[in-house]
Each structure stands twice: as C-alpha cells, then as structure tokens.
C-alpha cells in the first residue's frame, strides 16, 4: 500500500508541475499583437471603395487604391525586445496587385510622427494563393505606449494592364507584430 500511495503522490506532483509549467511556455510564444483584415478603419472618403468581409479587406470593383488603418494596442510582454517583426497575410495574384503596410508612431507630447517598419508586397512574387510574408527590424527603442501611439497603415493598390483596363485584386487578411 505504501508504495502505491507514494507512486500516486509522485504522479500527482509530476502532473501538477506540468500544468504549472505549461502556461509559461504558452505565454512566451503567444505574445503578439494581431489584427484581422476586416477590423481596420477605412477613411471616410474610401468607405464605398473597401469591402470588409469575412476576415479580409479588399477593394471594390473599379477602385484603384484605398488606405486602411489598424490601431496597435499594448500587449503585455510583446514589445520588450530588440527585433520586431511585422507579418502580413495578403493576396497578390498578379503583377498588377500591390499591398503595403507601414508601422507608424506619433509622439503624444509633440505630435512628431515616423515610420518604424515598412512592408512592400512588390518584393514577393505573385501567387494564386494567399501568402504570408514578414519584415523585421532591430528597433533600438522599445514601444512606449505612455508616450506614443502606434498604428499600421495598409495600402491596397491595383494598376492598369497594357490595354488600359484596371487589373489586380489586392486583399489583406491579417497583420501581426511580434518580438523575436
């Protein structure tokens, strides 16, 4: 009986230790700011030009370009590290489609603005499927939500083909900012 009781206690302690260690592992890998494409804010002048459906944002037919903004909110533990990565999930089926994303900041006290990261889909080949690509940068200063506000500005663009017809089908599915 004593061996069986000791074995049960050992198993219970091992399980408890495993459960206590699991959240630390999960939290360490799940610290990222994310936004679905359909949660962006569209300029008043672009309201009829952008469709926010399912999880994506896309241009309406006949529209050449539009701008969508995504507010970046503080995420505990995310912004403390030198290398920041901006990941963009987008649709670029042809050479007439372009998507770009800029991570901006504005200083609350002075109104000074600047760009921290820039993503340009023209660096990646067209693909009939949605693709996920990233850009990284070593940012000396960490995010400071007490002194600055941050947002990602996404541009969706399509261009005209050789016959003068507007072609392309840019879409944005998601954005993610992560610390590496």
Task: Place the predicted regions along the sequence by residue.
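Noncatalytic modules at the cell exterior or secretory-pathway interfaces
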Residues: 140-164
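Glycan-recognition and processing domains
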Residues: 27-64
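Extracellular carbohydrate recognition and processing domains
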Residues: 113-142
């Amino acid at each position: 009986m004593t061996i069986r009781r000791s074995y049960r206690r050992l198993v219970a302690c091992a399980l408890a230790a495993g459960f206590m260690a699991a959240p630390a592992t999960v939290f360490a890998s799940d610290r990222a700011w994310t936004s679905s494409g359909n949660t962006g804010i569209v300029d008043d002048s672009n309201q009829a030009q952008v469709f926010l459906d399912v999880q994506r944002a896309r241009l309406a037919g006949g529209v050449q370009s539009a701008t969508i903004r995504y507010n970046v909110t503080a995420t505990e533990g995310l912004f403390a590290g030198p290398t920041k990565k901006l990941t963009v999930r987008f649709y670029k089926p042809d050479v007439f489609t372009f998507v770009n994303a800029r991570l901006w900041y504005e200083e609350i006290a002075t109104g000074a603005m600047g760009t921290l990261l820039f993503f340009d889909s023209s660096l990646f080949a067209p693909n009939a499927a949605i693709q996920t690509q990233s850009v990284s940068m070593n940012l000396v200063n960490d995010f400071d939500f007490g002194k600055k506000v941050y947002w990602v500005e996404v541009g969706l663009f399509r261009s005209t083909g050789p016959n003068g017809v507007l072609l392309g089908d840019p879409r944005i599915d998601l954005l993610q900012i992560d610390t590496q």
